[in-house]
A protein has these predicted regions:
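Flexible, charged surface loops at secondary-structure boundaries
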Residues: 2-6, 15, 57-63, 97-98, ...
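Gly/Thr-rich phosphate-binding beta-strand-loop-beta motif of the actin/hexokinase/Hsp70
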Residues: 2-32, 134-152
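Long, hydrophobic N-terminal alpha-helical segment
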Residues: 20-23, 40-45
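Ser/Thr/Asn(+Pro)-rich, low-complexity disordered segments
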Residues: 25, 31-39, 50
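Short active-site-proximal "capping" loops at secondary-structure junctions
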Residues: 37-40, 72-74
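Glycine-rich phosphate-binding loop plus the immediately following alpha-helix
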Residues: 40, 107-137, 144-185
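Short beta-strand-loop/turn "lid" adjacent to the catalytic site in phosphate-handling enzymes
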Residues: 53-117
């Protein structure tokens, strides 16, 4: 167990119906907290502030910088950046709230095929920080999987696929009985 009180910043990712927070000291994660959340409820800075305060309350931390990826587009000034571009912007967009000093990391947008990455750009940046000269494709599996083409340190293009999410929507992953289609005729 690490001393979460030594954290000097927080990393936050909003993904699908999950809010995940890492208490960080430099480049090391000290603690992680995850909560299920209704993305429809995170429609304002004050709603996000309340959800984050509830999730981090057990840590009893002072006011720290909080870097956030994956927020819904529209309620911050962090306009998505068009690819090709670096995975993360030089500067995040400040969004102070009652309890936190949020720094919103802009999403990535693609014109054709139309696409938006909210949160995956930070995982790509993390991969590239460990693989400086990477030139190729990065696959990020998850409820929505991302395949991103990387060249010269930039995200050139990307494609997303509803893998796990689609499987959940279709059922428990077991094939239907052979008569299931016959019954619909």
């Amino acid at each position: 167990m690490t001393d979460v009180g030594k954290a000097d910043w927080l990393a936050v990712e909003v993904q699908d119906a999950r809010l995940q927070v890492w208490a960080m000291q430099g480049g090391s994660a000290l603690e992680t907290a995850t909560a299920e959340c209704d993305p429809a409820g995170l429609t304002s800075a004050s709603a996000f502030d309340a959800a984050l305060k509830t999730l981090t309350a057990p840590w009893q931390l002072p006011r720290l910088p909080v870097f956030v990826a994956g927020l819904p587009v529209g309620w911050t000034d962090a306009a998505p950046r068009m690819v090709p571009c670096t995975a993360t912007a030089e500067g995040a967009t400040p969004l102070p709230t009652d309890n936190f000093d949020l720094q919103v990391i802009p999403a990535l947008r693609q014109q054709s095929p139309s696409g938006l990455l909210r949160g995956a750009e930070t995982r790509i940046a993390g991969f590239l920080s460990l693989n400086k000269d990477w030139d190729g494709v990065v696959c990020l599996p998850g409820a929505t999987s991302v395949w991103a083409q990387i060249s010269a340190g930039e995200v050139v293009s990307f494609q997303t696929f509803l893998t796990g999410e689609l499987l959940d929507l279709l059922g428990d992953g077991t094939p239907a009985e052979g008569t299931a289609l016959d019954d619909t005729a």
